[in-house]
Amino acid sequence: MSSTNGNAPATPSSDQNPLPTRFEVELEFIQSLANIQYVTYLLTQQQIWKSPNFKNYLKYLEYWCNPPYSQCIVYPNCLFILKLLNGFMESAIVNEDGLLEGLDELPKIIQLQGPQWMNEMVERWAN
């Protein structure tokens, strides 16, 4: 493609499309936990949730439960799910393969109880 004035076509600069900040990435991930279907997917399709690193990351993300960070949350039920996941993971132990054990029931619990938790959240918002 040639330019009529002889100049090369403009390319997007990093100023026009900046990468998301760590704050934005973490906020997006935290809020995705409010989506029970996504959490179920994480716990059934991906083995990342059995990683001690993922356990540590979820624990680290609890700072979002406190102001001023919690004031940025649009879907507050995500904080409930974060605390729930961390509660389950506290009792997990690392096996000889370096994976977390003792979490086999977690996907089933999230899948079965998740819709009820979402309905309870909606009821709290309605009141």
Swiss-Prot record:
Component of the Mediator complex, a coactivator involved in the regulated transcription of nearly all RNA polymerase II-dependent genes. Mediator functions as a bridge to convey information from gene-specific regulatory proteins to the basal RNA polymerase II transcription machinery. The Mediator complex, having a compact conformation in its free form, is recruited to promoters by direct interactions with regulatory proteins and serves for the assembly of a functional preinitiation complex with RNA polymerase II and the general transcription factors. InterPro entries: Med31_sf, Mediator_Med31. The keyword Transferase does not apply. The keyword tRNA-binding does not apply. PANTHER family: MEDIATOR OF RNA POLYMERASE II TRANSCRIPTION SUBUNIT 31 (PTHR13186). Present with 468 molecules/cell in log phase SD medium. The lineage of its organism: Eukaryota, Fungi, Dikarya, Ascomycota, Saccharomycotina. Pfam families: Med31 (PF05669). This is Mediator of RNA polymerase II transcription subunit 31. It is found in: Nucleus. Belongs to the Mediator complex subunit 31 family. It comes from the Eukaryota. Keywords: Activator, Nucleus, Transcription, Transcription regulation. One of its GO terms (biological process) is positive regulation of transcription elongation by RNA polymerase II. GO terms for molecular function: transcription coactivator activity. Component of the Mediator complex, which is composed of at least 21 subunits that form three structurally distinct submodules. The Mediator head module contains MED6, MED8, MED11, SRB4/MED17, SRB5/MED18, ROX3/MED19, SRB2/MED20 and SRB6/MED22, the middle module contains MED1, MED4, NUT1/MED5, MED7, CSE2/MED9, NUT2/MED10, SRB7/MED21 and SOH1/MED31, and the tail module contains MED2, PGD1/MED3, RGR1/MED14, GAL11/MED15 and SIN4/MED16. The head and the middle modules interact directly with RNA polymerase II, whereas the elongated tail module interacts with gene-specific regulatory proteins. One of its GO terms (cellular component) is nucleus.
